[in-house]
Amino acid sequence: MADSTGLQFTVKVGALPESTFVVAEFALDEGLNRPFNLRLELASRQPDIDFGAVLDQPCELLVWYNGELQRRVCGVVSDMAQGDSGFRRTRYQLLVLPALWRLSLRQNSRIFQAQKPDEILSILLQEHGITDYAFALKNEHAKREYCVQYRETDLDFVNRLAAEEGMFYFHEFEAGKHRIVFADDAAALTQGPELFFNLGNRSLEQGPYVRQFHYREAVRPSDVELKDYSFKTPAYGLSHKKQGADLDHQRDTYQHFDFPGRYKQGGSGKAFAQHRLDALRNDAVAGSGKSNCAALQPGQTFSLTEHPNGGLNTDWQVVRIQHTGLQPQALEEEGGSGPTVYHNEFGVVKASSTWRARIGSPEALHKPMVDGPQIAMVVGPEGEEIYCDEHGRVKLQFPWDRYGSSNDQSSCWVRVSQGWAGGQYGMMAIPRIGHEVIVSFLEGDPDQPIVTGRTYHATNRPPYELPANKARTVLRTETHQGEGFNELRFEDQAGQEEIYIHGQKDLNVLIENNAVWHIKHDEHRDIDNERVTRIKANDHLTVEGEKRDQIKADYSLTVDASLHQKLGQSLLVEAGQEVHIKVGDKLVLEAGSEITLKGGGSFVKVDPSGIKLMGPAIKLNAGGSAGSGSGWGGKAPVVPKGVEVVKAPELVELVKAIPTEKAMEALLKEQGPAQTFFVPSR
């Protein structure tokens, strides 16, 4: 029942009868971008209320004036305490929070991919059973290619993500329920009451009023410039600048510059720069005050009238407010005397300005940083062994990602550090599916992983057993979709030093100029099939010992010009059947002392003493014909296969970064006569 002031506070908790509790006192703290906090001091004739009927149950506080509802607050009981018991009443303290508070009870690490911010927020809310929420968004918010919640509560992640996207949220209340509303522009605020400024002792009967209003202006950063880098557009500076408004009462040289800006697209960069500026200046023009209007709450505006300073008679939006209500008669004889009273203290900004949470404030904590490198597993589609994109990026499965499915959807494309990376030159070794890799994070940002190393583990063992082969340095690959390997191995054990090369199939070598080999001991070659060699100029061979050739089939030698042979001692030729020499013009056999032709028991001998012919008969012009040989039947050599000539990389003009003059503008404006600042020429 209301007292003489007309004020009354009532409460309904869970399924308990409305008469179970009476309100002795309440304190309600509300603000943009944070859950409200309602503390209730209650009294009950029951000294043994079941905590299970109260905790985690809905609770609703109603503020009445002359029988008319002025304000409703609905939430969930998160904390309950039983206090003193008197002759008739037992005191209870309840802490009531919105359903959004439940998100603070779960800490998680997970990855969202190719989803808009409002989609991510919806997923988190629905996972906690919150379906009464709305988005009042004026601006377009781009999909996030890769967004990580890392070792933070769901609530902290929601607050941070909303702040990064320039969103703020507030609560709306209806009978028995409350709604979370996400907005990104002041246009989403609802129009609240008109409140006059009470200079005297006008009562609530004349309407709600503001009894104290303080106005304040503060010097804040004047403009924001954010910069980032994308490997897809390395020459593009990704720098975006936004200038603040309402700078009449301060200098315009207080620039806030930050890198990285946490964006990869120009459109997002422009929006993020504006969001950062709005957040940094969210209290540049502000007000605070006290009123008796219980309807005031974040997410709405009110009009101030009748203030002596006419400039303050305008529309304001509530960004924070603390309500206090006392109803001492609820305690009956155990309470103090006095009327039921209510008042609030509020903080406001201009209704036309969009308030945004400042990253690093209680409303939006800083993004968690990854303390150091992590281990991850390379993953990809089923049936694949190597999975990458045109940039050599791979997909990863982190041990902490409980929602990942260890396939091509497990992460974003992650860049891989190589030992050398130039314009179409350098090194390239793609981590394969199943490999364990070391992952670092640029600026410690969980949204920007990069593979910086590879490691073996109990399943993926080194190519050779250790420590038995600790002196070996090995580069061994594995045949893709087959069996076998290629290998380059260095053995550094003293007395066993060796360079070993194994090719599973072909070896192709292309040397653009000279190849020089110096082998200080033996060279052994064993070719299981053919050897084909072509020398387009001269071939020089010097053998300082002996040379032995064994050919088990035919030997064909074709010389297009002359064949010169010089022997220091003897030329000894033995043919199993026939020696046939055919000369197109003349044949000269010259010997210093003797020439002998022998065949069939006859011979011709020419020496200094004369010519001797010996045979059963010597015939001159006796007819018959000369014997004939088999003739030349040699084969031409096969032309060797060529080596594919890889096209030389095109010349790439190196982009030299030039410092922007924007960063110097503020200094140049403040330059004194004796000061000199250097601005690099373009």
UniProtKB/Swiss-Prot annotation:
<dbReference type="Pfam" id="PF04717">
    <property type="entry name" value="Phage_base_V"/>
</dbReference>
<dbReference type="InterPro" id="IPR006533">
    <property type="entry name" value="T6SS_Vgr_RhsGE"/>
</dbReference>
<dbReference type="InterPro" id="IPR037026">
    <property type="entry name" value="Vgr_OB-fold_dom_sf"/>
</dbReference>
<protein>
    <recommendedName>
        <fullName>Type VI secretion system spike protein VgrG3</fullName>
    </recommendedName>
</protein>
<dbReference type="InterPro" id="IPR054030">
    <property type="entry name" value="Gp5_Vgr_C"/>
</dbReference>
<dbReference type="InterPro" id="IPR006531">
    <property type="entry name" value="Gp5/Vgr_OB"/>
</dbReference>
<comment type="similarity">
    <text>Belongs to the VgrG protein family.</text>
</comment>
<dbReference type="Pfam" id="PF22178">
    <property type="entry name" value="Gp5_trimer_C"/>
</dbReference>
<dbReference type="InterPro" id="IPR017847">
    <property type="entry name" value="T6SS_RhsGE_Vgr_subset"/>
</dbReference>
<dbReference type="Pfam" id="PF05954">
    <property type="entry name" value="Phage_GPD"/>
</dbReference>
<comment type="function">
    <text>Part of the type VI secretion system specialized secretion system, which delivers several virulence factors in both prokaryotic and eukaryotic cells during infection. Plays an essential role in bacterial mobility and biofilm formation.</text>
</comment>
<dbReference type="InterPro" id="IPR050708">
    <property type="entry name" value="T6SS_VgrG/RHS"/>
</dbReference>
